[in-house]
């Protein structure tokens, strides 16, 4: 009987020792995630001072910017032109389902951080509160353009949403949609007296990581928009037309 009593005391002491050595819960790591910042954009202007033909004529690639920040109303107009307007046009068609209408997502990299555009609500959702443009520029072939632009717009596509039905043509169709969006944004920038250019030479994996692009999406194009410098690197169709090639043939 005495032996069982001693054994019981030993077990109780061992259990107390183990319980006392248990680490307290680390509540410092269990912090609440900061609420997402949602910015309501102003309604876009449906009437401008420049005709469509003038916008086409004035369209040029601006590769150097002043670095001046764009106004929120300007960003809202670019976002509308890039996605909300085209979504409204697609909704008139019965070819695509509701899920397939949202093939693209637009990410806006600005001085205030990184934002995702929500076309249905016409809002910007902040997904990162730091300026990523310098880091983003390192993943592209046009570092000065990215870093000096007032805003860099990343166009990302979800090819998987069409893969089950279009199979091999899903990538082509998504690329075409990205092209429509890019052209709309470029022309909208011209109509607001802003400079812009598209960038397609970049490291997709690095851009996706830096921009925290959602899984299943693939970055297709980057559009840099800003205020052009007086001596910006530009090229227009008229400039190309005025160029002449001279062949020197030895006699």
Name every feature range the model reports, one short phrase each.
Residues 8-15:
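Bacterial N-terminal signal peptides
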Residues 195, 214-217:
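Phosphate/pyrophosphate-binding betaalpha-module
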Residues 22-149, 245-251:
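N-terminal amphipathic, basic helical "cap/leader" segment at the start of enzyme domains
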Residues 59, 78, 106, 151-162, ...:
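Small-aliphatic-rich amphipathic alpha-helix that forms the alpha element of a beta-alpha
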Residues 148-151, 217-219:
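Short coil/turn connectors at secondary-structure junctions
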Residues 43-45, 218-251:
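C-terminal helix-cap and adjacent tail motif
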Residues 1-4:
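Positively charged n-region of N-terminal signal peptides that target proteins for export
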Residues 18-20:
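Boundary at the C-terminal end of the N-terminal hydrophobic targeting segment
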């Amino acid at each position: 009987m005495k032996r069982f009593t001693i054994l019981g005391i030993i077990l109780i002491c061992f259990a107390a020792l183990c319980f006392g050595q248990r680490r307290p819960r680390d509540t410092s790591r269990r912090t609440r995630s900061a609420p997402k910042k949602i910015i309501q954009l102003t309604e876009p202007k449906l009437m401008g001072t420049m005709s469509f033909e003038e916008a086409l004529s004035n369209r040029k690639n601006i590769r150097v910017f002043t670095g001046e920040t764009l106004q929120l109303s300007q960003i809202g107009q670019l976002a509308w032109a890039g996605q909300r307007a085209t979504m409204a046009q697609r909704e008139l068609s019965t070819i695509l389902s509701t899920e397939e209408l949202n093939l693209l997502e637009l990410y806006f990299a600005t001085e205030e951080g990184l934002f995702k555009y929500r076309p249905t609500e016409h809002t910007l959702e902040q997904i990162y509160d730091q300026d990523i443009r310098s880091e983003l520029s390192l993943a592209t072939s046009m570092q000065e353009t990215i870093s000096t632009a007032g805003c860099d717009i990343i166009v990302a596509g979800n090819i998987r949403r069409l893969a089950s039905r279009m199979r091999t043509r899903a990538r082509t169709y998504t690329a075409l949609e990205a092209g429509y969006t890019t052209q709309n944004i470029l022309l909208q920038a011209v109509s607001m007296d802003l400079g812009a250019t598209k960038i397609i030479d970049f490291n997709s994996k690095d851009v996706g990581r830096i921009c925290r692009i959602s899984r299943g999406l693939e970055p297709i194009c980057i559009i840099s928009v800003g205020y052009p410098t007086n001596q910006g690197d530009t090229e227009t169709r008229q400039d190309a037309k005025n160029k002449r090639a001279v062949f020197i043939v030895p006699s």
